[in-house]
């Protein structure tokens, strides 16, 4: 994997920086693990925009990734190849199990074709293997961590992501996330050893607005250039300041304001990610 700065043959390529991984498969993805993916464009079932700045973009097939990895315990597996996935920042690996079944998983850092993998409590503590947290040594770097047993990985799934197992106490373990938050999870929750691969993803430079549109991301208009009917920062004669602290279009403070409202799981957070 390497960062490649393109030659300035056009304004769009002048500042472009690409992440090149020669180990990625160059052919078609594994067809049985593909599903149709329909454009939502940030709309809900009523057609109302629930997520702004989404729409357009290239068509993608969804790659069915196994985030649970709990029904192949003790079965030897081998990484067949690494692949690009347009639906996420991390790369994925096509894994062949000894019983003949193939599945996609999130590729960990250092994973290569031909590497042996195993799931379950008997698996060795080696990057790419998936185990219950009760069988993972304290201090181990992990990724693809479950929050609820059997629900599938929800934490540390993006490129370069990881968490650290800090402690085990009774039925719960403490996991420190990249944000600094320390969270309690049940020891029957599963996690994968190591960090997520494609860690240089955050260093890429897209280079031009059109490439962002290919990814289905639409422009973000500043509130200060809108009319008062559209945004609290809008209005004024000529170019004017917002006249107040930064807020969202709905008046919620935009800088440092806590919006977490799920009190039911507050007891599972040992240390918040906020400094104050």
UniProtKB/Swiss-Prot annotation:
Region annotation (Disordered) ranges: 38-59, 225-276
Keywords: Ribonucleoprotein, Ribosomal protein, RNA-binding, rRNA-binding
Biased composition regions of type Polar residues, renumbered to the chain: 39-49
Keyword presence, Cell wall biogenesis/degradation: no
Gene Ontology biological process terms from the UniProt entry: cytoplasmic translation
Composition-biased stretches (Basic residues): 50-59
Gene Ontology MF terms: rRNA binding; structural constituent of ribosome; transferase activity
Pfam families assigned to the protein according to its UniProt record, in alphabetical order: Ribosomal_L2, Ribosomal_L2_C
InterPro entries the UniProt entry points to: NA-bd_OB-fold (IPR012340), Rib_uL2_dom2 (IPR014722), Ribosomal_uL2 (IPR002171), Ribosomal_uL2_bac/org-type (IPR005880), Ribosomal_uL2_C (IPR022669), Ribosomal_uL2_CS (IPR022671), Ribosomal_uL2_dom3 (IPR014726), Ribosomal_uL2_RNA-bd_dom (IPR022666)
Role noted for this protein: One of the primary rRNA binding proteins. Required for association of the 30S and 50S subunits to form the 70S ribosome, for tRNA binding and peptide bond formation. It has been suggested to have peptidyltransferase activity; this is somewhat controversial. Makes several contacts with the 16S rRNA in the 70S ribosome.
Family, per entry: Belongs to the universal ribosomal protein uL2 family.
Subunit annotation: Part of the 50S ribosomal subunit. Forms a bridge to the 30S subunit in the 70S ribosome.
Protein name: Large ribosomal subunit protein uL2
Organism of this sequence: Cupriavidus metallidurans (strain ATCC 43123 / DSM 2839 / NBRC 102507 / CH34) (Ralstonia metallidurans)
Lineage summary: Bacteria, Pseudomonadati, Pseudomonadota, Betaproteobacteria, Burkholderiales
